[in-house]
Amino acid sequence: MRSLALSLHQKYNHTKMKKYIIDLRVVSLQHFNDKYVLLKLSSDEKLPAMLPGQFVEVRVDGSPNTFLRRPISINLVDYDRNELWLLVAAVGDGTRHLASLHEGDTLNCVLPLGNGFTMPKTPEDKWLLIGGGVGIAPLLYFGQEIVRMGAKPTFLLGARSESDLLELEEFCKLGRVLITTEDGSAGEQGFVTNHS
């Protein structure tokens, strides 16, 4: 089966994709720890085409110190359920406010932004996807689309400690997962860029 993202990438390669401003409803929040939260958002309308590696800009209403939209990587898109997942690291006023949202709250988003990742040309291509911390966010959607093409990615995921390893079950469903933690509490000790 041909991947939606691959066909979209071929269609929109070297052209600008149309941008949309849409309201998305929070359908669930998953707090991994006090720093990371997964927002699952839903639209009443059909979601526009989005490529792995693209991002959204989220307007943060109700945060007095946040004037600009916050860029957040697209973690996953489920077109059948009309859901968009965003993995947020609560490190500033704007992202802390996003992490404190509740089910039913609405977020105004501009999407899709950015060019997206280069997709494999054939299922035989080998892919090593590397990310650490919240930088793993776009790799889940990317890995999902690589698997849909028939390829098998390997993920190299890093975090400060075991409690900061995010969405491991989801990644393990898609391919081999190698882990690096800075404190050595899981996987190999060190930075993800130094994994052996």
Task: Map each language-model feature to its residues.
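Generic alpha-helical secondary structure signal
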Residues: 13-16, 59, 145-146
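FNR/FR-type flavoprotein reductase catalytic core
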Residues: 93-196
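Generic N-terminal simple sequence motifs
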Residues: 3-4, 44, 134
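Ferredoxin-reductase
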Residues: 18-103
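N-terminal amphipathic/basic-hydrophobic helices that include classical n-h-c signal peptides
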Residues: 1-16
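Intrinsically disordered, low-complexity N-terminal regions enriched in serine/proline/glycine
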Residues: 11-13, 35, 190, 194
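Intrinsically disordered, low-complexity regions
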Residues: 14, 18-21, 156
